[in-house]
């Protein structure tokens, strides 16, 4: 099977690929990392502190704007306003706040830095030049540790590349997933 993971989903995909190498044909890791750095842990602590206030608006304002590039956020102001109208009520629900805290806490001690080299399947690592949540340096670490991995940067995009540049993101994912096991032949 081919597996793709974005951000936290990439962490899950890494763990699955390491533990089940015989089940993964191709792996795509987008805007993710091999470990939760101290810096990222502090960001998560901040998100949890805001979630504990019960304010969906405060949670939205703390977590959502930073996942987009500044250019996208400003260019797509109307779209962002619609997202805000949907997400603030959602983030205001106590059950959602509890689940967001559990999600953040579940990656607190995540560290596969010493195991990602065990990934042997063809792997595509997608980075984004404007990702300030999981910066490109984290994907470079993955690329250096996963032998034979391919590395690509989506320029101008932030952490939410699937929204910011869906054409590039989709082309990369589908192109890599559907690539012949024999590679590219001309």
Give each language-model segment a name:
Residues 112, 121, 135-144:
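Short alpha-helix in the alpha/beta-hydrolase fold that links the catalytic acid
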Residues 119, 125-127, 131:
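Short beta-strand/loop motif that positions the catalytic acidic residue
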Residues 7-10, 20:
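Active-site loop->helix "elbow" adjoining a glycine-rich segment at hydrolase catalytic centers
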Residues 38-40, 58-115:
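Conserved alpha/beta-hydrolase catalytic His-Asp/Glu region
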Residues 14, 18-19, 25-55:
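Flexible "cap/lid" loop of the alpha/beta hydrolase fold
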Residues 149-186:
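Catalytic active-site module of serine/aspartate enzymes centered on a nucleophile-bearing elbow/loop
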Residues 1-7:
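Alpha/beta-hydrolase fold nucleophile elbow
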């Amino acid at each position: 099977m081919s597996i793709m993971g974005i951000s936290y989903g990439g962490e899950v995909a890494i763990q699955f690929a390491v533990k089940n190498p015989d089940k993964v044909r191709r792996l795509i890791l987008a805007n993710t990392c091999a470990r939760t750095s101290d810096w990222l842990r502090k960001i998560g602590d901040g998100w949890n502190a805001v979630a504990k206030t019960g304010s969906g608006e405060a949670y939205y304002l703390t977590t959502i704007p930073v996942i987009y590039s500044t250019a996208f956020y400003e260019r797509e102001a109307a779209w962002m306003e619609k997202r805000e109208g949907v997400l603030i009520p959602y983030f205001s629900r106590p059950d959602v706040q509890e689940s967001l805290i559990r999600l953040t806490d579940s990656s607190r001690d995540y560290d596969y830095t010493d195991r990602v080299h065990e990934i042997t399947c063809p792997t595509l690592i997608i980075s984004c030049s404007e990702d300030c949540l999981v910066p490109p340096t984290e994907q470079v670490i993955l690329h250096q540790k996963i032998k034979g991995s391919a590395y690509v940067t989506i320029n101008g995009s932030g952490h939410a590349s699937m929204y910011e540049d869906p054409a590039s993101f989709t082309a990369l994912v589908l192109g890599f997933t559907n690539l012949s096991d024999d590679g590219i032949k001309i």
